[in-house]
From Swiss-Prot:
<feature type="binding site">
    <location>
        <position position="103"/>
    </location>
    <ligand>
        <name>Zn(2+)</name>
    </ligand>
</feature>
<keyword id="KW-0479">Metal-binding</keyword>
<comment type="function">
    <text>Single strand-specific metallo-endoribonuclease involved in late-stage 70S ribosome quality control and in maturation of the 3' terminus of the 16S rRNA.</text>
</comment>
<keyword id="KW-0540">Nuclease</keyword>
<dbReference type="GO" id="GO:0004222">
    <property type="term" value="F:metalloendopeptidase activity"/>
</dbReference>
<dbReference type="Pfam" id="PF02130">
    <property type="entry name" value="YbeY"/>
</dbReference>
<dbReference type="InterPro" id="IPR020549">
    <property type="entry name" value="YbeY_CS"/>
</dbReference>
<dbReference type="GO" id="GO:0004521">
    <property type="term" value="F:RNA endonuclease activity"/>
</dbReference>
<dbReference type="GO" id="GO:0006364">
    <property type="term" value="P:rRNA processing"/>
</dbReference>
<dbReference type="InterPro" id="IPR023091">
    <property type="entry name" value="MetalPrtase_cat_dom_sf_prd"/>
</dbReference>
<comment type="similarity">
    <text>Belongs to the endoribonuclease YbeY family.</text>
</comment>
<feature type="binding site">
    <location>
        <position position="99"/>
    </location>
    <ligand>
        <name>Zn(2+)</name>
    </ligand>
</feature>
<keyword id="KW-0862">Zinc</keyword>
<feature type="binding site">
    <location>
        <position position="109"/>
    </location>
    <ligand>
        <name>Zn(2+)</name>
    </ligand>
</feature>
<dbReference type="GO" id="GO:0005737">
    <property type="term" value="C:cytoplasm"/>
</dbReference>
<keyword id="KW-0378">Hydrolase</keyword>
<protein>
    <recommendedName>
        <fullName>Endoribonuclease YbeY</fullName>
        <ecNumber>3.1.-.-</ecNumber>
    </recommendedName>
</protein>
Amino acid sequence: MIDFDNRTDYEFDINKLNDIYNLLTDKDIELILTDDEEIKELNSQFRNKDKATDVLSFPLEAMPGMPLGSIVISIDTAKKGAEEFGHSVDDEIRLLFLHGLLHLLGYDHETDNGEMRAKEEEIIKKLNLPSSLIVRNED
């Protein structure tokens, strides 16, 4: 189950994430949709980066019955990404959710040998989503 906390005025149908969620996990996940100001504070506090970002993931310890973790997405940055790459804001949120969920599942594109990129591309092709974050950020 996805526990959705929308802290913005943007109306997003959480059911648009069910296909990604069902392909990757059956664990509970918290999803927070926020703005650049709040995500900047979190990024500074937890990653020592004093800037807004698109998505943050906070995994929880692997304990039976516990949620997998939390994903925080900035709607402000998602809107910019959607405009820059020519797709809908909803598709950008789906991409960010996929990226964040893969991090919760233990993937790390900064340290792995392409496993996260391959998994992200596999899901993107299966669900006919726009280009992945990893591929976009490598250009």
